[in-house]
Amino acid sequence: MATPVHDDVIEFAGDYRLKSLVITNHKGEGFDSTQRGVDIKRLMTELNIYEGIYKSAITGSVVITDTINLIGRLPIQGTERLSFKLATPGAHEAAHLIDFTERSGHPMHIYKLTDRQQISESVQVYTLHFCSREFLRNIRTKVSQS
């Protein structure tokens, strides 16, 4: 019999708690105008977040096993936002949470879709790459000497 997972107990190194992983289109909607986004946590296979002292932005990727035709129904164009909140088990203070939600004002932005593979007629696997707002700002801003 499996033991229940407790939110306050670290099960293994690198353990984290993720309540939801919500993708929102450029209109701030999910599949239709009545939804505020689509929770894709159950479609997620892998989540990676990268930050470095020599990088000016946070980047990451999420591997999706798509059984609901998310690409076609949303559709994914590269202008979507990805919202989520991570916490280490046992961390309850706001200072210990990693908050990339719409409410905090710092959602991630999807900028690329790679490694798309059709597994079966109704299942495909792909990787969504996301970044912080600063990454997009650095790409779009041109600095010139006057």
Question: Where would I find each of the regions flagged by the language model?
Answer:
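Assembly/oligomerization scaffold segments
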Residues: M1-R140
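Conserved, well-structured core segments that form or line functional sites
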Residues: S144-S146
